[in-house]
């Protein structure tokens, strides 16, 4: 399966159903009153975290997501049905961005509200009053929220295996877990992150084999640089280093990877690190291990052979010990700060601009909402639009800019001819 970890999507919640104008028409009911029902709400769009997914590939082919619209109200005060919600599965670890602002971090297998459906419009029954017993007033349903979003996947793994190409990371992942990562005796066998489940007695954790890193990976060199972001999610970083070759220098390899991680993100240096000295079955292994321990006497190091699966239990014990310490550290530092989805628009300034000779456009979210919400289906509704535009300062703004009589004023798809008559 192709690995995709960043996509752009267009999300659109459902429009609310329209309210209607209706009056009772029944036998033996003289002058029946208003009974127009409200429209149903538009459907919401949710992202659902799914541990069974590990790529955003589905959005690569289908990047438009929309929920159903609500139905219009009906006579006899019958409400329209609500639009069906759209629930989309995404991998755990998916970050949702709107204009570079993080609005959701999908880290749990639950539903995250991404776009709210519009409210249903009110029918004329809702406008009945002592002064107006037979209102010919109703509202259209509100538009659902619509956003252009960027999804970024950062693999959720407890332990990240990092190292130079051909260090044996894929072989180790296969030996430790149920994964079946491709292995071969050449560089860059692993082209995308591979996940596996590591079990040790009654404990378990996820482990990720990340593509091999080379010098200046943090600056974009090699294949591994584009996957460095996945390391940020890990709680423990495990350096897999080839100690079994006379052509490789384990100390230099470790220092190279350490520098790239630091250059990419300073916070990675603060995570627990363990050195996995691989290829203990080779003759030169002991010599290289001795040199490394002399250079870094305090670093935790475990000698193993991924190929022959030697000393893996000791490695598992060391990993889970470090994970436990990392989890305790996280608990002591954690601050409850769930990301709230609150996409706010700029302050709503009332503006007017000239489009052409005798054609002007009003720009304001509030004003646009008025003309979208109130249908021009009755004289009462037209008067209502007129009063609201006046209260919002539209007419005063038009006068201030000396717009000539008879000029066309556009507000979205709504337009009228300007007259200064009260």
From Swiss-Prot:
Name of the protein: GTPase Obg
Enzyme class, UniProt record, top EC level: hydrolase
UniProt gene name: obg
Main localization (coarse): cytoplasm
OBG-type G domain mapped to chain residues: 157-324
Subunit structure: Monomer.
Residues engaged in binding GTP: 163-170, 188-192, 209-212, 278-281, 305-307
Residues annotated as domain OCT: 342-420
Keywords tagged on the record: Cytoplasm, GTP-binding, Hydrolase, Magnesium, Metal-binding, Nucleotide-binding
A single GO BP: ribosome biogenesis
CDD domains: Obg
């Amino acid at each position: 399966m192709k690995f995709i970890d960043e996509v752009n999507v267009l999300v659109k919640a459902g429009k609310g159903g329209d309210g209607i104008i209706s009056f009772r028409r029944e036998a033996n009911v003289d002058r029946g009153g208003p009974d127009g029902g409200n429209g149903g709400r538009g459907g919401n769009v949710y992202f659902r975290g799914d541990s069974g997914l590990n790529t955003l590939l589905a959005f690569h082919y289908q990047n438009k997501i929309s929920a159903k619209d609500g139905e219009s109200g009906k006579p006899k005060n019958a409400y329209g049905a609500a639009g069906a919600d759209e629930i989309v599965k995404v991998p755990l670890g998916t970050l949702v961005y709107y204009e570079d602002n993080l609005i959701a971090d999908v880290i749990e297998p639950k539903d995250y509200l991404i776009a709210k459906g519009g409210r249903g419009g009110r029918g004329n029954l809702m406008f009945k009053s002592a002064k107006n017993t037979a209102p010919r007033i109703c509202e259209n349903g509100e538009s659902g929220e619509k956003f252009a979003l960027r999804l970024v996947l950062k693999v959720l793994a407890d332990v990240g295996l990092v190292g130079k190409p051909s260090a044996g990371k894929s072989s180790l992942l296969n030996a430790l877990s149920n994964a079946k990562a491709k292995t071969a005796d050449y560089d860059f066998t692993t082209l995308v992150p591979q996940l596996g489940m590591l079990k040790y007695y009654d404990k378990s954790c996820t482990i990720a084999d990340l593509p091999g890193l080379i010098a200046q990976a943090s600056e974009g060199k090699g294949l591994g640089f584009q996957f460095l972001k996945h390391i940020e999610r890990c709680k423990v970083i495990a350096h897999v280093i080839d100690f079994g070759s006379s052509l490789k220098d384990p100390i230099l390899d470790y220092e190279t990877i350490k520098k790239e991680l630091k250059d990419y993100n300073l916070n990675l240096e603060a995570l627990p690190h363990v050195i996995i000295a691989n290829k203990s079955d080779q003759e030169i292994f002991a010599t290289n291990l001795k040199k490394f321990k002399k250079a870094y006497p305090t670093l935790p190091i475990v000698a193993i052979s991924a190929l022959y699966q030697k000393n893996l239990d000791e490695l598992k014990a060391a990993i889970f010990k470090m994970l436990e310490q990392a989890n305790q550290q996280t608990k002591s530092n954690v601050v409850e700060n769930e990301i709230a989805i609150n996409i706010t628009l700029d302050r709503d300034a009332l503006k007017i601009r000239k489009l052409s000779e005798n054609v002007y456009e009003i720009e304001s979210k509030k004003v646009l909402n008025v003309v979208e919400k109130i249908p021009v289906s009755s004289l009462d509704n037209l008067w209502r639009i007129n009063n609201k535009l006046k209260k919002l300062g539209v007419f005063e703004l038009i006068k201030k800019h000396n717009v000539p009589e008879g000029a066309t004023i556009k507000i979205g798809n709504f337009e009228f001819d300007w007259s200064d008559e009260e």
